[in-house]
Design a protein with these regions (language model features):
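Short loop/turn motifs that initiate or flank beta-strands
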Residues: 1-203
C-alpha cells in the first residue's frame, strides 16, 4: 500500500519584536537616582494580536538625582515576559524613557515665642522639616535658615507671624526643595498685655 500522509521536519522561528516608546515616569525628590522598574511600560511592535507578551526591565535609574538635571531614565535588563514570550525575540536589552523629579516639600516651622508688651524682641528660631533621607540643613548652603517677624516694636499686644527664610526664599522652589511655611507660623509670636497696678491689663 502507498501511504497517503507523510511527515517531515518543521520549525517555527521566533518573531522579532521591537520596542516602542517608553512611558514616562516621575517621582518626588528623594536624594537618589532610583527609579521604579515595575513601572516600565513600552509598546511592542510586530506582536500578534491576542498573544500574551510584554516587555519588563530588571532595573531603572535616573540620569541624575537632582530636580533640575533629571530628564531620563535608563532601564537595563529588558526582556520579554508572558505566556507567549517564547515565540518572540527582542534585540534590545536596554531602553531609555523620559523621567522627571519634582521638588520635595520642606516646611519651615517657627518656634513659638511669648513676651510681655514693652519687652525687647526675642531671637526667632525654628526648624526645617521634610529633608530626604541622609540630608539635613547643610544642603541649604551658606545662607542657612533664619526666622524673623515683621514686628518692629512690642507695644501692641496680639499674635503675630514669624517667617522662615532660606537666603531670600520664603515660599517657592529652592534647588530640590519647595519651601513652605508651617500653618502655625502665622501666630507664632505672642505679645501679652502688661499688668497694671490693681491687676488691670494694659490694652
Amino acid at each position: 500500500t502507498i501511504a497517503d500522509t507523510a511527515q517531515g521536519a518543521g520549525t517555527i522561528t521566533q518573531r522579532a519584536l521591537t520596542l516602542g516608546a517608553v512611558t514616562a515616569q516621575t517621582k518626588t525628590y528623594d536624594g537618589t537616582t532610583a527609579a521604579d522598574a515595575s513601572k516600565f511600560r513600552a509598546a511592542l511592535t510586530n506582536a500578534i494580536a491576542g498573544d500574551s507578551v510584554t516587555a519588563a526591565a530588571a532595573g531603572a535609574a535616573y540620569n541624575d538625582k537632582n530636580v533640575a538635571r533629571a530628564n531620563r531614565i535608563d532601564y537595563p535588563g529588558v526582556a520579554l515576559r508572558g505566556a507567549d514570550a517564547g515565540n518572540y525575540s527582542l534585540a534590545a536589552t536596554t531602553a531609555q524613557g523620559a523621567g522627571t523629579i519634582t521638588p520635595r516639600d520642606l516646611t519651615l516651622t517657627a518656634d513659638a515665642k511669648k513676651i510681655v508688651q514693652g519687652e525687647p524682641l526675642p531671637s526667632f528660631t525654628g526648624r526645617a522639616e521634610g529633608f530626604a533621607d541622609g540630608e539635613d540643613a547643610s544642603v541649604l548652603g551658606a545662607d542657612g535658615l533664619t526666622f524673623e517677624s515683621t514686628v518692629k516694636n512690642t507695644e501692641t499686644p496680639g499674635s503675630y507671624g514669624v517667617t522662615g527664610r532660606i537666603g531670600s526664599v520664603t515660599d517657592g522652589v529652592l534647588g530640590n526643595y519647595r519651601i513652605r511655611q508651617a500653618t502655625g507660623n502665622a501666630t507664632a509670636f505672642t505679645i501679652h498685655a502688661a499688668a497694671l497696678p490693681g491687676g488691670l491689663l494694659a490694652s
